[in-house]
């Protein structure tokens, strides 16, 4: 991953790098890989995340439709 540093503005480049890493999900992946996760735990976590996403999408859909 590359970020351009313009006019020696390192702070702005770091901010852009953090934003890119956040968008790519690198911080989340680093957090998950700090410790070993058993395959069964991974499946349970992914299933819970899928349920959470489905509920969120349903709430958004109902909010848009006005029910």
Curated annotation (Swiss-Prot):
PROSITE patterns: RIBOSOMAL_S21. It comes from the Bacteria. Pfam families: Ribosomal_S21. Residues 37-67 are annotated as: Disordered. Residues 37-52 have a biased composition (Basic and acidic residues). One of its GO terms (cellular component) is ribonucleoprotein complex. One of its GO terms (biological process) is translation. GO terms for molecular function: structural constituent of ribosome. Keywords: Ribonucleoprotein, Ribosomal protein. Gene3D superfamilies: Ribosomal protein S8. Signal peptide: none annotated. Belongs to the bacterial ribosomal protein bS21 family. This is Small ribosomal subunit protein bS21. The gene is rpsU.
């Amino acid at each position: 991953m590359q970020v351009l540093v313009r006019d020696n503005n390192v702070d702005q480049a770091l901010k852009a790098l953090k934003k890119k890493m956040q968008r790519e999900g690198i911080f989340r992946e680093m957090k998950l890989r700090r410790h070993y996760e058993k395959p069964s735990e991974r499946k349970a976590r992914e299933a819970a995340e899928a349920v959470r996403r489905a509920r969120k999408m349903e709430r958004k859909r109902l909010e848009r439709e006005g029910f």
